Structure formats: C-alpha cells, structure tokens
Amino acid sequence: MDVNPTLLFLKVPAQNAISTTFPYTGDPPYSHGTGTGYTMDTVNRTHQYSERGRWTKNTETGAPQLNPIDGPLPKDNEPSGYAQTDCVLEAMAFLEESHPGIFENSCIETMEVVQQTRVDKLTQGRQTYDWTLNRNQPAATALANTIEVFRSNGLMANESGRLIDFLKDVMESMDREEVEITTHFQRKRRVRDNVTKKMVTQRTIGKKKQRLNKRSYLIRALTLNTMTKDAERGKLKRRAIATPGMQIRGFVYFVETLARSICEKLEQSGLPVGGNEKKAKLANVVRKMMTNSQDTEISFTITGDNTKWNENQNPRMFLAMITYITRNQPEWFRNILSIAPIMFSNKMARLGKGYMFESKSMKLRTQIPAEMLANIDLKYFNDSTRKKIEKIRPLLIDGTASLSPGMMMGMFNMLSTVLGVSILNLGQKRYTKTTYWWDGLQSSDDFALIVNAPNYAGIQAGVDRFYRTCKLLGINMSKKKSYINRTGTFEFTSFFYRYGFVANFSMELPSFGVSGINESADMSIGVTVIKNNMINNDLGPATAQMALQLFIKDYRYTYRCHRGDTQIQTRRSFEIKKLWEQTRSKAGLLVSDGGPNLYNIRNLHIPEVCLKWELMDEDYQGRLCNPLNPFVSHKEIESVNNAVMMPAHGPAKNMEYDAVATTHSWVPKRNRSILNTSQRGILEDEQMYQRCCNLFEKFFPSSSYRRPVGISSMVEAMVSRARIDARIDFESGRIKKEEFTEIMKTCSTIEELRRQK
C-alpha cells in the first residue's frame, strides 16, 4: 500500500514538524593538524576590523598594540570595533536607572564570593595553557605547576588556599625581574638492544631549571594558547578557540561572577540559566510585547545574528564597564576586577604548533614551529598562507602574536551579555521618545529583537536606530544573516518559538545510544537520556517505549550480552549461558550479565541494580556489589556521576546520572605509550594529586562535607579533623585509650615534620 507522507501531517500543527527537518545525523567534523592558520586568520581579522585605531607599543614587552576605542565611526555596514566609551557608560547608567540597585547588589554578592573562593576553583575546566611547560595541560596539573613555581620563587601568599591570595602572588610575580621555572625535557640516545642486537632510540625525561627575565615571563603570563574548535556542525571552515593560562583565569572568574550576578537580575538575559527555565524567561518577554501590541500597534521580531561578535568586542570597553559598575565599591575590589580586562588588552595569542611540510619526492616531513614564522623565507608557502604570514609578522614576538583588540571565543560571555542587554534596555519608550519601542533577548552573541510600532515605517525606523546604537558599542548586527518575521515566530539560541517554544526533539538524537564508558554507566546514561527527553522535549510515551527497546538492543549488541536463553553466538555467550543456567532467579540478572530488561517508562529513574536487587540470588548479590571483590570499582562512583552529552547544536551539556558501584563499573586502563614520553613526569604528578585528594576525601567525606573554613592547608585541616574525630570516638567508647594516644602522637609528629620542613 502506498502511503502519502503528507497525510502524516494533517493532524499535526505545522510547528511540530520541526523535528523532521533535522540535518545532523552522523558524526560531526573534527579538525586535524595544526590550528596555526586559523589563529592567524583570527588575529588578522581582528586587526582589520579595528585598522583605523591608534597604534602604541607595550613598554614592558615591546608588543605593538592597536586601540580602536573612540575611533572613527563607520560610514558603511562593514563590521568594526570602534566602540565609543561615553556611549557605553551612558548605556550602563540607563541600565542602572531601569533596575535600581542592580550593580550595587551584585557587587556585594560578588565581594562575598571573592573572599570565600578557594584556589581549587581553578582546577575545574579542561585544557589550560601551562606557561611553565609552554603547552596545554589538564587544569589541575597546570595550577599545581604554577603554584610550585611560585613557591620556589618565594611567593607564599597562595598557601592560605584562598583564590584571592593566589592572585596576589600573580600580581607580585609580574613585578619580579626574573622568575625561575622547572621545565621537562627529553633526551634521546641510540643504544644497542641486548636481545635483538638492533639499534633503538632510548628516551629519558629530565627536569631542568630555567630562568625567565621579566619580559619573557610577562609574555607567557599574558599568553592565550589556541586550538581548533572541534565538532562544529554546519560550517565549512574551522575556527580557533583560546585557552588562557592560570595567571588570567582567576581574574576572569571574578569578573564573570559579577557579570553572572547582574545577568540573573536582567529579564532579557538568556544566561546563566538554561533549559526550561530559560524558555520560561524568554516567553515572558515575548508575552509582554504581544499583549501591549494588540490594538494599535504591529509587532515584528528579528532573529538576529551578529558579525564576529568577539573580534569586535574590546577589553578596554569591559574595563570601562567594570569601572562604572563598581564605582562606589572599596578600592581593593575595583582593582581585582579591573585586572582581567587590562591583561586582555595586553594579551598575546600563541600560534600553535606551526606548519607541517612534506616533500613527496624525498619522503621527508618537517615541522616549521610557529617561532620560525617571523623570519623564514616565504617562498615555501602557498599564496594565501604567505599573505597571512606577511600580515601577522609585525605583531610577532617569540612565536606569539600581539592581539590587543578582540576578546577570543568564550572568555567574557556574561559581561558581553550585559553589554548587549544594555542596548535592549534602551528600547523603552521613555528612552526612544517616539512611537516605536523595542525589547528582546540576549545570550552572549545571540539575540532576538522585538520591535513594536504603529506602522511599518515605525518598525523600520526602530530597527535602524537599534542597528546604529549597536555600532556605537562595537556590536555589528549582520543585515545579511538576520531576518524579520511577525512576532510569534523566531529562533533564539537554537530554541524555535512559534506561539510558544517548540520542542525540537531531533536535536537530542545524537545523545541517544550507548556512550561507551562502561556497562554500568552506559545503562544509567541511556535510560536517563530517555527520561530527560520525556520531561523536557515532548518525547511521548509510545516513542519513549520504542526508544527504550532500541536502546536495550543497541546495548546488548555493544557489550555482546544477549539474553542467556538466546541463540545468538558471541564471544561472551558461553559464559553468559553458564551463568543463566546456574541462576535460580533469572529476572535478577543485570542486562549486562544476560538478564532480561525490566525497564519501562515508569521506572527509568531507578538504577538497574536497585530495580533488580530483591530479585537477585544471594551469591550473585555478593559478587556483584561486594566492596572486597577486586573487580568492583569504587574509584569514580560518587553516588552521582556526570556525563558530557553532545547535542547536535549548542554547547556540550553536563548530565547527571545515578550509578551503583558494581563489577560492571570498570575504568579502562590508560594507554601505556604515555609512560615513555615527556608526559610521564606529569602523569606521576597527577597520581600524587589523586592520592592526596582521595586522602582528603577520607577525612571530609561528602556526606559531612563542610569545607574547612578559615585559612589552613590541607594537612592542617586533616590533622585538626583527625584530633576532633579521635576525641569524639574515644569519649563515646568507640576506640580504646591506646588507639587514641597513638592517633594524637601521630598528629603531633606530622606537625613537627611540617615545622622542620
């Protein structure tokens, strides 16, 4: 029988058909090779947008810097970064006038955070530029290396463990005439292998001390390393993103804390909330505009797109904003917040790995590191690369490019949102003083603008005024990529609005399926994704039930754990059949042990082990969850786990799922090849941190986890905790006098050793 597909949609409102338009199946594109070209593009473009600014030279590093602030106003529609200070300050003043006390209150909240935040805040985050080794490292390692170098240079404020004290060390380090660092290096030598009698290359890892003079240190402290952004869909070209070093991160964190606090109080801000909360917030703004426009006015909405948002933003503008926002606050607070924008106006972009050349005829490959680009003969490069290098050469210092204007991706999302909202705020009638008015939504560089006016001419005038106001603040609305519709249909941050936000379920498709972490986590994540989509994305019960069956099927094929009574032969089927036959209560077997699936859409919130616990044979329970069983990994499981979900569009989302530590929650072993590289020292450091943190967790278990308040080191905190616990246990008779005395003696010994050190 032929089915006419249009019949499927007869009963469906048009907006619900959005999920059928989804183009993103399959894997997103990843980048290969070096990001040097993309970074040079970013640097060159940023300077081009500000080319009519003033050139100056940084007195400390000698880096040439371009300052477009208060530069000539553009005469055409080309993107430009000439923000006008007085306009930005006025926009801030009007924002405060419409929201009395907003800046004052946010400053008070932030001041509290600044005084309480501990330095371990900086261990969050993935890759970080490690200035001591001049390459990227996991955040925790980069922080540890920085602190280690600070201490060996006599900078000790960080020992208090407060972030603000660590930042005092950062400030002081910039005044030092020289800084001594420890770097890793590799020695290669050819030796004869005793067994095979062949020559082999032996690598040994050494650590060596190196002195950096003030200029070299400042360049490193102000450096942002660059990488290529991966997994971006819908783009032909890749682009560069930046990872700042530890000196900058802490200051940025405090600025963003202040900006976040302001955004929370602004109804037009799409940050920092997300998901349903964000949809509700946005729907309110739309409702306000539609109810006011019913009789006399018409209402239109622009789905907006800005050209090169962060390349036209300017740290100097952010400095002006912060100076205004904190104007009645204590000096120390104003200083600490102004450092991030100052560092960004003096930033250097590291060009990455450089270029790879290969000669087909001689079968030779060689890497030209970024440091050599300043004086290498350009005849080896093709035309487009040659142009890039020629353009960037005046800006190069030691393989990094001076990049004063522009912000680099993702650095000040919250603060730039405040800037955007300040323009939306100017759309009130009391400011436009005419018949048109506007409002809208802003989330980082994405915006939606709603304009109301008595007639079409008024709408046009309103849009023009908005466009020109943006130009004054260094924001460039793209006329080519923005489009206008009757209010009621628009898109904002990948949410599609049509008389209400439409659930675009297909966006979530990539996160369905088996993640490949381990059998325990994958089962939990799989059912949690289905549960979340029933809550948030209009996934109906019938479809959810089908998704669940498909997931179980996928899971069984991935881990070769078909039911014990199946005919399918796999590598595991022999073991699974044996287990099936000797199990009395077969319903109690986990799916990953060949058991049946007991999940349905009503019990998705229960971890599988809990769901089947009552049904399990006793000896099976004893093997599955016995903490003494060496195969039960308790290492990662902390009652709640986090998985990173990649939706098809938009940022990766953190998703919490429950999992129970069982023999199935294994952690795969690290690749052994790392042990022979210069990373080995780093690996050992990491393991040491892991051990220290695990020990600390033992003293302060999550259930009673009150952060040790006050200024004490980890060791002091653990010793004092041990003493308190020992006294309580002794007085309640849980431990004997001898044990109590021994604990007290050990504590004193530890303190004595610390004093001697």
From Swiss-Prot:
Entry EC no(s): 2.7.7.48
Processing after translation: Phosphorylated by host PRKCA.
MF annotations from Gene Ontology: nucleotide binding; RNA binding; RNA-directed RNA polymerase activity
Chain positions covered by the region annotation Promoter-binding site: 249-256
UniProt keywords, alphabetically: Eukaryotic host gene expression shutoff by virus, Eukaryotic host transcription shutoff by virus, Host cytoplasm, Host gene expression shutoff by virus, Host nucleus, Host-virus interaction, Inhibition of host RNA polymerase II by virus, Nucleotide-binding, Nucleotidyltransferase, Phosphoprotein, RNA-directed RNA polymerase, Transferase, Viral RNA replication, Viral transcription
Reaction(s) the record says it catalyses: RNA(n) + a ribonucleoside 5'-triphosphate = RNA(n+1) + diphosphate
PROSITE patterns: RDRP_SSRNA_NEG_SEG (PS50525)
Enzyme class: transferase
InterPro entries found in the cross-reference section: RNA-dir_pol_NSvirus, RNA_pol_PB1_influenza
Membrane-crossing residue ranges in chain numbering: none
Region span, Disordered: 53-82
Record keyword Nucleotidyltransferase present: yes
Domain RdRp catalytic: 286-483
Keyword Lipid metabolism: no
Gene Ontology BP annotations: DNA-templated transcription; symbiont-mediated suppression of host gene expression; symbiont-mediated suppression of host mRNA transcription via inhibition of RNA polymerase II activity; viral RNA genome replication; viral transcription
Motif Nuclear localization signal positions after renumbering to this chain: 187-195, 203-216
Gene Ontology CC terms: host cell cytoplasm; host cell nucleus
Subunit structure: Influenza RNA polymerase is composed of three subunits: PB1, PB2 and PA. Interacts (via N-terminus) with PA (via C-terminus). Interacts (via C-terminus) with PB2 (via N-terminus); this interaction is essential for transcription initiation. Interacts (via C-terminus) with human PKP2 (via N-terminus); the interaction competitively inhibits the interaction between the RNA polymerase subunits PB1 and PB2.
Role played: RNA-dependent RNA polymerase which is responsible for replication and transcription of virus RNA segments. The transcription of viral mRNAs occurs by a unique mechanism called cap-snatching. 5' methylated caps of cellular mRNAs are cleaved after 10-13 nucleotides by PA. In turn, these short capped RNAs are used as primers by PB1 for transcription of viral mRNAs. During virus replication, PB1 initiates RNA synthesis and copy vRNA into complementary RNA (cRNA) which in turn serves as a template for the production of more vRNAs.
Family the UniProt entry places it in: Belongs to the influenza viruses polymerase PB1 family.
Name this polypeptide is given: RNA-directed RNA polymerase catalytic subunit
UniProt gene name: PB1
